[in-house]
Structures are given as structure tokens and as C-alpha cells.
Design a protein with these regions (language model features):
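Amphipathic alpha-helical scaffolding segments comprising HEAT/armadillo-like alpha-solenoid repeats
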Residues: 328-338, 360-372, 392-407, 427-439, ...
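Acidic/His/Gly-enriched intrinsically disordered linker/tail segments
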Residues: 67, 122-185, 189
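Zinc-dependent metallopeptidase catalytic helix centered on the HExxH motif
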Residues: 36, 76, 82-143, 203
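Hydrophobic helix-coil surface modules that form long, contiguous segments used
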Residues: 1-98, 127-130, 329-333
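Amphipathic alpha-helical substructures
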Residues: 24, 169, 176-263
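Beta-strand-rich binding/interaction modules
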Residues: 232-233, 243-317
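Structural detector for internal amphipathic alpha-helices that build alpha-solenoid repeat scaffolds
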Residues: 320-324, 347-359, 370, 380-393, ...
Length: 588
């Protein structure tokens, strides 16, 4: 219940509506406007037209989940709402919009028969994000989405959890990176193994056979087996009814006397489990490639390939789809060849990562310079992130190139990364680049420009920050303005900074970034009422973080943020304020 702007759209004669708070009415179609195209794409992909009479999407304040796929009426948290300047960077909610829509096939049309099989809902919804980005923005974008999903799984403590879990403490435990991101990556591998035709025809059979009913992982297996003609029992036993993932050590060598390339793959996971893995190994001589399908089935597998000369590159998992941790003995020349000739997103990403670690090598520098002009913004941004222009050996190679690219870079986050890199030069000449960009339509670019300007002309940056403080600010510009006013201001800035901090969404990175500057302002604050309000805001943020993350975040809040405030206040002899902070720390 609330005051909403209702923005109407349609798909094949069916109502498609977007409910947003009135101020977001003018940009509702920029947020949700790809929905009809998604409906067309997912209908074609599954072979099942969107099966419901209408589709509405609405936002709500303080919603406990990110979003929920209520049939025909998806509810999104308020973080979905973005103004025009935020959308200049990207639509941060586009993946979630695709995710919840795809649930109308996998979750609503066919529903998981129990919490244990939740992944047949959530893995498909998660994977829909990869599918959508691949379709809409190209294979690199889809591969990047897939990579970040794999990272989310690998970074957590998830190796002991089966994808289908019959034992769990609470049903909420099932909503994790295993059911979602790991499940999505397992589908990606399965698609690669079966091929697109069999995979998507299998999904169609699964949906049409089980429509308006409940189903489990075995129903999915049977549908895919019927269409593909392949036995998938081993795959489902390994990935759906098992836990963990392979850790692979891959060693490449060449035996000149035998004219033979050798690949040794060792599984090093300490679980007692050996994975069965179909994959491809590509062997390159210049631009020429030979492809070889192999099966990894033992603790150590060795493969031999006839090769008249030493290969320029041997590329294991050449489609880059395996859910695995890999260690390879490739050298710089191998990765350079991989970047220019293998070509998919992960091939290029791996090469840029390696060159970042070998950045003092001339060949690595040359590749990074080329990567600044990569066709995909994700690779351009990654290459920029490897550069530290505080170091003279890097400045002399990269500085002028980055400065020349700022004006022509179309992707706003990459442009912002370039500005941040230039800021590290402490070169006053770049003020002519920074000053116009503090008014850029992108909050991210404007914030990066203002932060860089503050390094070379703090007085000018302070004046601009004061002027901006009277406007509605978000994202990085908000953080930078607040940081500058906190750094150079005094207690008089408390009301503005506290108000800004309190309004930030707890899911935004800006809230974390602002916590330290806000704490520094509280160190300067002597008014007990204002000081307590500030401490309460920090504690409110600490307590609002989901319980599963607090083992990581609580030490930061308690020992770094609040601990630093206590230390500073003790040095100043402000015992009353020390007591206020001590009272909100956990009892030891």
C-alpha cells in the first residue's frame, strides 16, 4: 500500500506494468523496460510462451529479500529503483529482473517438489542472468556474468554442501551460493556438454511434461536424457547429489624427440572424491588450432598429442566452462598467445590477470596497453585496475595512454577507473580533464573526477563539494563529497553527513565506503547528542547486515570503526563519549 506511479507496457497483448515510487515514474521503463524483450527471448528459448495472463513488477521499502517471483506480480526491494544518473552507469537490477521473470517458468510453471530440490527453481533463475546478458550484450557479457557467479560460490564456505540437500537445519539455509550460483554453473557445464540444441529441447520437455506440477532433479535428468540420448546419471550423482568441486593442477610440456605435447592433469582436492570431467584441450601453432575432447577420470590423467613443433599454447578447458579451481604452468608468452588467439572472455581475463602480476615485463606492459582498447568493457576495466601510476616505471608507459583514452571511453565505470588511475599521478595538469567531468551525468564518473581533483587542488574540490552537498547525490559522488567535507570540515558538517549516511541502502557498497569517513567525523564531534546519533547509525548498520555475513563484518565494525573512535576519544579525555561507544560493543 502506498503512492505509486504505474507505468504501463505490454507483451503480445498482455498487460506488463511497473509500479514505482512517483519520482522514479519517468525512468521506470529504463529500469524495467527490457521486460517484454526478455519475455520474448525466454519464451523462444524454452519453447513455452510466457504462460500467465499478465506480468507486473513493483517495488517496496524495507523488503526482507532482494525480490520475489510471486506469479504475475514480482516484488522488488527499493534498491531496484535508480534515477537517470545511476542508470547512466548500468542498470544494476537488470540481472534480478531477468532472474525473477525466468522463475515464471522454473518455479511457478514447474515448482520444486521440496526444499531439498530448491535448486531446480533457483539454479535456472540464476543461470537466466547469464543467458540474458549473453543474448542482449554478447558472449563476453554472458561469460562475465558466469564468472562472477562462479566467484560467488568459490569465495564462500560451500564445499561440503550437496546441491540437492536432504538434511538442513532451516529451510532458509537452502538459499545460498550452492542452490543459486553453483547450480547455475552446473547448468552451464551441462549445456556445454550436451550442446545448445539438446539442452534447450530438454528444458522444453521438462517444462511441458511437468507443467503446473512439482518436480525434482530426477525429472530434469530424465528429460535431458530422453532428448540427448545420453546417460546423465553420473553427472547428476556427481553434481546434484554430491558436494564440492575439482581442484586441478595442469602441467604442460613438450618432448622434442618424440614430437609430442603432454598434458598432465592432477586432481588435488582433499575430499577423497575424484570428479569425472569431459572437457576440451586446444593446441595452437600460430593462428592454427586443433581441438581435442578428453575425459578427466582419475587422480592423475596424462594426455599425449602429436605435434611437429612446440605449441605456442595448450589451452585446457578451452571453452572455460568448468566449475573448478585451476593451477596451470603457463608462462607469459603462453598467456599473450591466449589473449590474441583464443579470444573468449575468460581467456582474455586470465591473460590480463597474469600480465598484471608480471607488469614489469615489457611484453606484459604491451599486452595491457592493447587491453585498454579491448572490445569488452569488462576487460578494459580489468586492465586499468592492474595499473599503479604512483610507480614511475608504470607512469612512463601507461600515463599518457590512459590520459588520451578518458575522453573517448564510452563505458562510465571504466572511464571512472581511468580517472582514479590518473589521480595517482598527482599531476596538476590533469585538472583540465577533471573539472568538466565533475558535472558528468554519471555519479561514478563525477565522483572519480572530484576525488582526483581533490588530490591536486583541494581548495577547488572543497568548494565543489560544498555546492554539491545541496543536491541529491548517490553512489560514488555521494561518497566522495561526504568524504571531502568530513576530511576538511568540522562538527558543523554533522547533520549533512549523518543524514546522507543514514539514507544509504545497506546493500550498497557506498555505505561501507562511507563508514570510515563518518567515523572520522565522529572523532571530531563533541556534542553528546550528535555523537550518540552517529554511533547509533553505525550500530544500526552493523545489526542490519544478514547474520551469515556478520562473522566477517562484526570485527570490522567493533575493532576497527568503533575501536578507533574509542582510542581517539580516550586520548582526548572525553570519557562520557567513550562510555557511549563501549556500551554498544559486545560483552567479552
Amino acid at each position: 500500500v502506498g503512492n505509486y506511479a504505474v507505468v504501463k507496457d505490454s507483451w503480445r497483448g498482455k498487460e506488463v506494468n511497473y509500479y514505482v515510487e512517483p519520482e522514479y515514474g519517468p525512468v521506470a521503463k529504463k529500469i524495467f523496460g527490457n521486460t517484454p524483450e526478455m519475455m520474448t527471448y525466454f519464451s523462444k528459448l524454452t519453447g513455452v510462451d510466457y504462460p500467465w495472463i499478465k506480468y507486473s513488477q513493483m517495488t517496496a521499502r524495507d523488503y526482507v529479500a532482494g525480490a520475489m517471483e510471486n506469479t504475475t506480480a514480482t516484488l522488488h526491494q527499493e534498491f531496484a529503483q535508480q534515477d537517470a544518473r545511476e542508470l547512466t552507469d548500468e542498470n544494476r537490477w537488470e540481472g534480478t529482473i531477468a532472474h525473477e521473470l525466468f522463475h515464471h517458468w522454473f518455479g511457478d510453471y514447474v515448482t520444486a517438489e521440496s526444499w531439498s530440490h530448491l535448486t531446480v527453481n533457483e539454479s535456472f533463475a540464476d543461470y537466466s542472468q547469464t543467458l540474458w546478458f549473453e543474448y542482449k550484450y554478447g558472449k563476453d557479457a554472458g561469460d562475465a556474468e558466469n564468472y562472477w557467479g562462479m566467484r560467488a560460490y568459490l569465495q564462500g564456505d560451500n564445499t561440503k554442501k550437496d546441491l540437492v540437500r536432504f538434511y538442513y537445519s532451516d529451510r532458509e539455509d537452502m538459499f545460498d551460493a550452492v542452490s543459486y550460483q553453483k547450480g547455475g554453473r552446473i547448468l552451464h557445464m551441462l549445456r556445454n556438454y550436451l550442446g545448445d540444441s539438446a539442452f534447450f529441447k530438454g528444458l522444453n520437455l521438462y517444462l511441458t511434461t511437468n507443467k503446473f506440477k512439482s518436480a525434482e532433479a530426477h525429472h530434469l535428468r530424465l528429460a535431458l536424457e530422453e532428448v540427448s540420448g545420453k546417460d546423465l546419471t553420473w553427472y547428476f550423482n556427481q553434481w546434484y547429489f554430491g558436494s564440492g568441486h575439482p581442484k586441478l593442477n595442469i602441467n604442460y610440456s613438450y618432448q622434442q624427440e618424440k614430437k609430442q605435447a603432454m598434458v598432465v592433469v592432477k586432481q588435488t582436492q582433499n575430499t577423497g572424491k575424484i570428479f569425472r570431467i569431459p572437457t576440451y584441450i586446444d593446441i595452437y601453432h600460430g593462428k592454427n588450432k586443433s581441438r581435442n575432447m578428453v575425459w578427466i577420470e582419475n587422480a592423475i590423467d596424462t594426455f599425449y598429442f602429436t605435434s611437429e613443433t612446440k605449441p605456442d599454447l595448450i589451452n585446457f578447458d578451452s571453452d572455460k566452462v568448468l566449475l573448478a579451481e585451476k593451477t596451470e604452468n603457463k608462462n607469459l608468452d603462453n598467456y599473450i598467445h591466449q589473449y590474441y588467439h583464443s579470444g573468449n572472455y575468460m581467456d582474455r581475463r586470465e591473460a590480463v590477470d597474469f600480465c598484471g602480476r608480471k607488469i614489469e615485463e615489457p611484453k606484459a606492459k604491451a599486452l595491457l596497453l592493447d587491453a585498454f582498447a579491448d572490445s569488452f568493457h569488462g576487460i578494459r576495466g580489468l586492465a586499468i585496475s592492474k595499473i599503479d601510476l604512483k610507480k614511475e616505471t608504470q607512469r612512463e608507459v601507461f600515463e599518457k595512454k590512459i590520459a588520451s583514452l578518458v575522453a573517448t571511453e564510452k563505458n562510465r565505470p571504466v572511464k571512472a577507473s581511468m580517472l582514479t588511475a590518473l589521480g595517482n599521478t598527482n599531476n596538476k595538469e590533469y585538472s583540465i580533464i577533471y573539472l568538466p567531468l565533475v558535472n558528468d551525468s554519471s555519479y561514478t564518473v563525477a565522483g572519480a573526477a572530484l576525488a582526483a581533483l581533490e588530490i591536486v587542488d583541494s581548495a577547488k574540490a572543497i568548494d565543489i563539494a560544498k555546492a554539491f552537498s545541496k543536491q541529491t547525490l548517490k553512489k560514488r559522488l555521494n561518497t566522495v563529497v561526504t568524504t571531502i567535507l568530513t576530511k576538511y570540515g568540522d562538527e558543523q558538517m554533522f547533520d549533512f553527513v549523518a543524514s546522507t549516511y543514514g539514507k544509504l541502502n545497506i546493500q550498497s557498497s557506498e555505505k561501507f565506503e562511507m563508514t570510515m569517513p563518518f567515523a572520522q567525523l565522529l572523532i571530531k564531534t563533541t556534542d553528546p547528542v550528535k555523537f550518540k546519533k552517529g554511533i547509533d547509525l553505525i550500530v544500526e548498520f552493523r545489526e542490519a547486515i544478514p547474520q551469515g555475513y556478520r562473522v566477517q563484518t562484526d570485527p570490522y565494525f567493533n575493532f576497527k570503526i568503533l575501536g578507533d573512535i574509542i582510542k581517539a576519544k580516550k586520548q582526548k579525555g572525553e570519557t562520557e563519549l567513550v562510555a557511549m561507544v563501549t556500551a554498544v560493543l559486545p560483552k567479552m
